[in-house]
From Swiss-Prot:
<dbReference type="InterPro" id="IPR014721">
    <property type="entry name" value="Ribsml_uS5_D2-typ_fold_subgr"/>
</dbReference>
<keyword id="KW-0808">Transferase</keyword>
<keyword id="KW-0028">Amino-acid biosynthesis</keyword>
<keyword id="KW-0547">Nucleotide-binding</keyword>
<dbReference type="Pfam" id="PF08544">
    <property type="entry name" value="GHMP_kinases_C"/>
</dbReference>
<dbReference type="InterPro" id="IPR036554">
    <property type="entry name" value="GHMP_kinase_C_sf"/>
</dbReference>
<dbReference type="GO" id="GO:0004413">
    <property type="term" value="F:homoserine kinase activity"/>
</dbReference>
<keyword id="KW-0418">Kinase</keyword>
<dbReference type="InterPro" id="IPR000870">
    <property type="entry name" value="Homoserine_kinase"/>
</dbReference>
<dbReference type="InterPro" id="IPR006204">
    <property type="entry name" value="GHMP_kinase_N_dom"/>
</dbReference>
<dbReference type="GO" id="GO:0005524">
    <property type="term" value="F:ATP binding"/>
</dbReference>
<dbReference type="GO" id="GO:0009088">
    <property type="term" value="P:threonine biosynthetic process"/>
</dbReference>
<feature type="binding site">
    <location>
        <begin position="91"/>
        <end position="101"/>
    </location>
    <ligand>
        <name>ATP</name>
    </ligand>
</feature>
<comment type="pathway">
    <text>Amino-acid biosynthesis; L-threonine biosynthesis; L-threonine from L-aspartate: step 4/5.</text>
</comment>
<comment type="similarity">
    <text>Belongs to the GHMP kinase family. Homoserine kinase subfamily.</text>
</comment>
<dbReference type="GO" id="GO:0005737">
    <property type="term" value="C:cytoplasm"/>
</dbReference>
<keyword id="KW-0963">Cytoplasm</keyword>
């Protein structure tokens, strides 16, 4: 038996649309992500458990786990009869890399179960392919940090897909999911097909500056440059009161904030735990729309996916 945990992640990290992603873990030590358990069986079998298992497709062949299993078997050219348990603890369409959690956990579990026929690069490529089939385009800004941990810069080079970027150890990342859903495909469709040259230059300047500030360990510069000129101006239509919320948490003391992935989860950053707790309390009171929503104060998760059983 193999049991794998894969963490939630923040896609884009504000300034890096489809280029940056960060794995997160609550500061209280709890695990925020999905679990996948693989056992030997005489045929494929899938059991869905967890908080959000009732949101998964009833048809097994529409489940991400089945798609991962099939793609893995086709890749290694072997049919592997297994029983898989998916513990779905991440809300679907939340902007926290929910699909990436299931993809990464399943493919790593299958690879471990089969004595690692695929290397880490081959696995990551496979993860990107499955993510692309679900969302409409291959992107690694959730699967890479979920798999590798930390803050990842997505290069998509044939030899180097992703590189780990230094982060700031004293940053607290507050993530707030309101309890609603924004499908990734819908959030991508709302974006323009073309951008003005000035917008592209400005976004490139801020992204380059953020990477420089990360390597030179200038937290205030990095926080100031975490602005999104590509997706946020259009996706705010999908997030009622987003600009109001962003302004309020800035007044409380957030040094940066933005939309996590496609939303509706938003993230904010503080370099002080007391301020982080105040932001968390305000978001809990004012951003959550139902009882399933949540707010977590997190660190970046440097481990990424891991075997826990």
């Amino acid at each position: 038996m193999i049991k794998i945990y894969a963490p939630a992640s923040i896609g884009n990290v504000g300034v890096g649309f489809d280029i940056l992603g960060a794995a997160i873990i609550p500061v209280n030590g709890s695990l925020l992500g999905d679990f996948v358990t693989v056992k030997l069986s005489n045929k494929f079998n899938l059991v869905n458990k967890g908080i959000f298992s009732n949101k998964l497709p009833k048809n097994t062949e529409q489940n991400i786990v089945w798609k991962c299993w099939l793609k893995f078997c086709n890749t290694i050219k072997r049919n592997i009869p297994v029983s898989i348990i998916l513990e779905k603890n991440m809300p679907i369409g939340s902007g926290l890399g929910s699909s990436a959690c299931s993809i990464v956990a399943t493919l790593v579990a299958m690879n471990e179960f089969c004595d690692k026929p695929l290397n880490s690069k081959e696995l990551l490529l496979l993860m990107g392919e499955v993510e692309g089939e679900i969302s409409g385009s291959i992107h690694y800004d959730n699967v890479a940090p979920c798999y590798l941990g930390g803050l990842q810069l997505i290069l998509e080079d044939s030899k180097i897909i992703s590189q780990t970027i230094p982060n700031f150890k004293n940053w607290f990342w507050i993530v707030a999911w309101p309890g609603t859903k924004v499908p990734t495909a819908e959030a991508r469709d709302i974006l323009p097909k073309k951008y003005k040259k000035e917008t592209c230059i400005k976004n490139s300047r801020y992204l380059a500056g953020f990477i420089h500030a990360s390597y030179s360990q200038q937290p205030h510069l990095a926080a100031r440059l975490m602005q999104d000129f590509i997706a946020e101006p259009y996706r705010i239509k999908l997030l009622p009161n987003y600009l109001y919320v962003k302004e309020k948490i800035k007044k409380i003391g957030a040094i940066s904030s933005g939309i996590s992935g496609s939303g509706p989860t938003i993230f904010s950053i503080s370099d002080n735990i007391n301020t982080a707790q105040k932001i968390s309390a305000w978001l809990t009171e004012n951003y959550l729309q139902n009882t399933t929503g949540f707010v977590h104060i997190c660190f970046l998760d440097s481990k990424g996916v891991r075997k826990i059983g």
